[in-house]
């Protein structure tokens, strides 16, 4: 099977391509390298077709001619373009990952410099306007009708998409795995991440309200991105990952991708109900996820 992933979100497309190849498929990802903030595309370089924003559409069409499956991540606009170009000769899959369908009212700035904040604010403004246009013109609904299947990466997205199929995020267990011998240095007991979408003050208030007496490191991933290749070593400096996340004032019930990666590395994870979890659940094993995806492709 020849599979072309269009765009990537949080490394999901790259991990799928890697394990699809291990299962004997010809799978690759076309992505704009300038958007590779965390070095994920660089880490999975052998699976990447590099493009610029200017030539992304044309390169996507060129590569799509030889593909059986066009698996589009977030870019619902590409569904129309591919269906118009190829009619029903290609199977088109649309996958949503979170804010691409849920939306977000407010995003934080990295505060590296005034120039940086100005540039990032411009990007945020563009995204909000783009999302408003997509909703107003019912682009998402139309794209979902044109796709052969629509996938969501977390269960909370199911009510937002008619006839959606939930597919767990695959975690690269070759990359995220426990050390054979524990050698964690003495430092803060727990870790949590401050990201563009998260209200970290609500997270800390939650911990205080629930009497969670933890020594927590709050890492600002907006200002200081951690490269994907370095992420396992960084996580394994801690024993517990606090995965309590508020977006637009609402607590998220699903485990974040970082929390899943922490579980794969051997950390405990504190979820939104203050439950401690240990061990990566089997549904996130990449071979299991790709097997489930094959059944979606074959429908």
Label every model-predicted segment.
Residues 1-7, 60-79, 93, 240:
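Short N-terminal targeting/anchoring amphipathic segment
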Residues 33-35, 100, 156-157, 167-177, ...:
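Short beta-strand->alpha-helix junction loop in the catalytic core
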Residues 59-65, 100-103, 111-149:
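Membrane-proximal helix-turn-helix segments that form the acceptor-binding/catalytic region
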Residues 130-178:
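Donor nucleotide-sugar binding/catalytic pocket of nucleotide-sugar-dependent glycosyltransferases
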Residues 172-228:
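Conserved catalytic-core segment of nucleotide-activated headgroup transferases in glycan assembly
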Residues 236-238, 258-268:
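Conserved donor-binding/catalytic loop of nucleotide-activated donor transferases
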Residues 243-260, 270-274, 278:
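Nucleotide-sugar-dependent
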Residues 275-299:
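A charged, aromatic-enriched C-terminal amphipathic alpha-helix characteristic of glycosyltransferases
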């Amino acid at each position: 099977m020849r599979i072309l992933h269009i765009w990537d979100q949080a490394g999901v497309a790259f991990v799928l391509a890697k394990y699809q190849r291990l299962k004997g498929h010809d799978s690759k990802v076309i992505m704009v390298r300038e958007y590779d903030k965390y070095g994920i595309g660089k880490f999975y370089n052998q699976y990447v077709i590099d493009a610029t924003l200017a030539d992304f559409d044309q390169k996507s069409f060129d590569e799509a001619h030889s593909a059986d499956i066009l698996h589009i991540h977030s870019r619902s606009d590409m569904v129309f373009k591919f269906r118009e170009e190829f009619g029903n000769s290609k199977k088109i899959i649309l996958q949503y990952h979170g804010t691409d369908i849920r939306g977000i009212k407010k995003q934080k700035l990295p505060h590296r410099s005034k120039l940086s904040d100005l540039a990032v604010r411009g990007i945020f403004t563009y995204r909000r306007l783009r999302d408003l246009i997509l909703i107003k013109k019912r682009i998402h609904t139309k794209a979902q009708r044109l796709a052969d299947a629509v996938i969501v990466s977390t269960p909370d997205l199911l009510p937002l998409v008619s006839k959606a199929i939930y597919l767990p995020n695959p975690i690269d267990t070759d990359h995220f795995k426990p050390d054979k011998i524990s050698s964690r240095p003495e430092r803060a007991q727990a870790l949590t991440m401050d990201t563009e979408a998260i209200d970290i003050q609500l997270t800390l208030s939650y911990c205080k309200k629930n009497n969670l007496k933890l020594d927590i490191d709050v890492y600002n991933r907006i200002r200081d991105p951690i490269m994907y290749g370095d992420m396992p070593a960084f996580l394994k400096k801690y024993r517990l990952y606090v995965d309590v996340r508020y977006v637009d004032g609402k607590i998220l019930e699903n485990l974040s991708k970082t929390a899943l990666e922490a579980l794969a590395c051997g950390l405990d994870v504190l979820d939104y109900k203050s439950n401690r979890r240990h061990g990566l659940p089997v549904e996130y094993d990449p071979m299991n996820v790709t097997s489930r995806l094959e059944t979606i492709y074959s429908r």
